[in-house]
C-alpha cells in the first residue's frame, strides 16, 4: 500500500531542557522573630563593656610608654615607678569622681616635687664602703644621716671629717635648678601622655589632648636633651646610680 506525502508526515521535535527554579530559591527567607533569638545575660554585656575599657586603657599605656621611653632617663628612678604603681589603684575602672580627681592631682604634685628636690641631692662613698646622701647647699653637702664618730660602736664607721662639706663639687649651682625644672617638665609630659590622667583632669577634651600630646613629649625631649648638654651634671643623688 502506497502512502502519499499528504498521508505520511514527519514531525521533528527539538527538546529544550528548561531548568525549573528550585522551590527554595524562589521563596524569600522568613523573618526570624526576635523572641526566638538567644538573649545575652546582663552581666555579659557589662563584662564586655569593662573588657573594652580595659583594652583601651592598656592601649593608652602602651602608647604612653612608646612615646616617652626616651624621656625616662631624665627622671629619678623611683618617681616614675611610684606613679605607675599608684595610678591604677586610683583610676580603677575609669570612675573619675571628685575624690579620684583630687587624688590624681595630689599624686601629680607629689611626683613633681620628688623630681624637683631629688636633683638637689648628691652622694659620696666613704672609706667604709658605704654611700651617704645629702642635700647640696651654697655651703656644701648637708648629709641626711651623719655617720657615727670612731669609738661609738666601732667597726665600719668613718670620721665626720670625711664628709665633703666644703668641696666645690657639692655646692649649689645653676645647673641644679635647670635639671630640676627640666625633670618636672619631663614628668608632666609622661603623665599627661596617659589617657587615664587626661580623661579625669580634662573630661570631654580627649581628642584635643591627643593632638597636643602627639608632639609635646617629642618637643620636651629635644629641649631637655639640648639643655642637659649645655648644663651637664655629675650628681648622683637619690634615685640615681652611684659610681
From Swiss-Prot:
Membrane disposition: Multi-pass membrane protein
Keyword Oxidoreductase: no
Subcellular compartments: Endoplasmic reticulum membrane; Vacuole membrane
Keyword Membrane included in the entry's annotation: yes
Stretches with biased composition (Low complexity): 14-29
Renumbered residue ranges of the record's region Disordered: 1-37
Location, primary (coarse class): endoplasmic reticulum
One Pfam family it belongs to: DUF679
InterPro entries given in the database record: DMP
Signal peptide: none
Tissue: Restricted to flowers.
Domain of life: Eukaryota
UniProt KW keywords: Endoplasmic reticulum, Membrane, Transmembrane, Transmembrane helix, Vacuole
GO cellular component, one term: endoplasmic reticulum membrane
GO biological process, alphabetically ordered: endomembrane system organization
Function: Involved in membrane remodeling.
Protein family per UniProt: Belongs to the plant DMP1 protein family.
Name of the protein: Protein DMP8
Taxonomic lineage of the native organism: Eukaryota, Viridiplantae, Streptophyta, Embryophyta, Tracheophyta
Amino acid at each position: 500500500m502506497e502512502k502519499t506525502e499528504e498521508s505520511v508526515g514527519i514531525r521533528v521535535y527539538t527538546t529544550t531542557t528548561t531548568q525549573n527554579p528550585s522551590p527554595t530559591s524562589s521563596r524569600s527567607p522568613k523573618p526570624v522573630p526576635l523572641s526566638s533569638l538567644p538573649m545575652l545575660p546582663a552581666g555579659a554585656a557589662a563584662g564586655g563593656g569593662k573588657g573594652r575599657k580595659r583594652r583601651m586603657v592598656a592601649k593608652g599605656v602602651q602608647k604612653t610608654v612608646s612615646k616617652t621611653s626616651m624621656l625616662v632617663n631624665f627622671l629619678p628612678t623611683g618617681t616614675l615607678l611610684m606613679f605607675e604603681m599608684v595610678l591604677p589603684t586610683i583610676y580603677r575602672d575609669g570612675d573619675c569622681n571628685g575624690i579620684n580627681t583630687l587624688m590624681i592631682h595630689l599624686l601629680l604634685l607629689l611626683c613633681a616635687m620628688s623630681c624637683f628636690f631629688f636633683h638637689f641631692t648628691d652622694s659620696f662613698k666613704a672609706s667604709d664602703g658605704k654611700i651617704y646622701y645629702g642635700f647640696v647647699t651654697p655651703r656644701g653637702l648637708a648629709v641626711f644621716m651623719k655617720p657615727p664618730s670612731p669609738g661609738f660602736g666601732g667597726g665600719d664607721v668613718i670620721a665626720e671629717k670625711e664628709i665633703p662639706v666644703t668641696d666645690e663639687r657639692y655646692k649649689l649651682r645653676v645647673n641644679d635648678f635647670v635639671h630640676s625644672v627640666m625633670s618636672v617638665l619631663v614628668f608632666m609630659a609622661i603623665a599627661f601622655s596617659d589617657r587615664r590622667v587626661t580623661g579625669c583632669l580634662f573630661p570631654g577634651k580627649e581628642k584635643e589632648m591627643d593632638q597636643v600630646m602627639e608632639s609635646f613629649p617629642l618637643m620636651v625631649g629635644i629641649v631637655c636633651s639640648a639643655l642637659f648638654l649645655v648644663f651637664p651634671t655629675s650628681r648622683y643623688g637619690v634615685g640615681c646610680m652611684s659610681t
